[in-house]
Amino acid sequence: MSEKVCEVKNLTYIYPKSDKGVKNISLYVNKGSIVGLLGESGCGKSTLAKCISGQLKPGEGEIVCKKIGYIFQDNYASLNPAKKVGWLLKETIKYGNPEKFFEYEKRIKNILEEVELDESVLTHYPNELSGGQRQRIGIAMALLSNPNILIADEPVSALDVTVQKQVIKLIKKLNERKNLAILFISHDIKVVREICNYIYILKDGELVEEGESETLFTNPSSEYTKNLLDSSYLE
């Protein structure tokens, strides 16, 4: 039986003074799997991700997740522009493992190798890096906590097609090498089909269908999913 590294039961979060949010969501992610959360923009994907990662507190439901690493859509917004990359990585290590702070040089070298970056990036500020390099730094920072699961919130949507493919390839490698579970959130159908082995479909804050990737793509059961998959990219 597969080990669950993250499970959500009957989760509901509604934004204050609004009817927007997510309602009665239940899902799970097994160790070593890449699970997709697919839906149109504004359907609640990022809200759900923020609830799972602790950025938002749900009004109802239960979340049981082991150690989480979070990859943002645009890591330029999450990286301190006034600090060089080397400092950012050191502080991430210090925050997550203060007792091992003295090992930071070795840890940083290893993590840069994992995300396929040269050590020269350490002396640069985030705005001096390309979008692909910043996203790799974001992935490196997420990995520094030794997570059991990565939540990847639209991790390639801000990148051009060539760089998208490179980052997707890297995420696949990390999944295979580390047996790392990944919750991959996207509105790009082609990307989700390429990388995910199980998919949840979200519409207006509610789950409408779930299933193994190829089964869902070849034989969807809901009318909404059928219409959704007729397009190759959701605006």
Predicted regions and their residues:
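Helix-to-loop junction immediately C-terminal to a conserved catalytic motif
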Residues: 53
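A short, proline-enriched helix->beta-strand linker immediately N-terminal to the Walker B motif
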Residues: 144-148
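A short, surface-exposed alpha-helical micro-motif characterized by mixed small hydrophobic
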Residues: 192-194
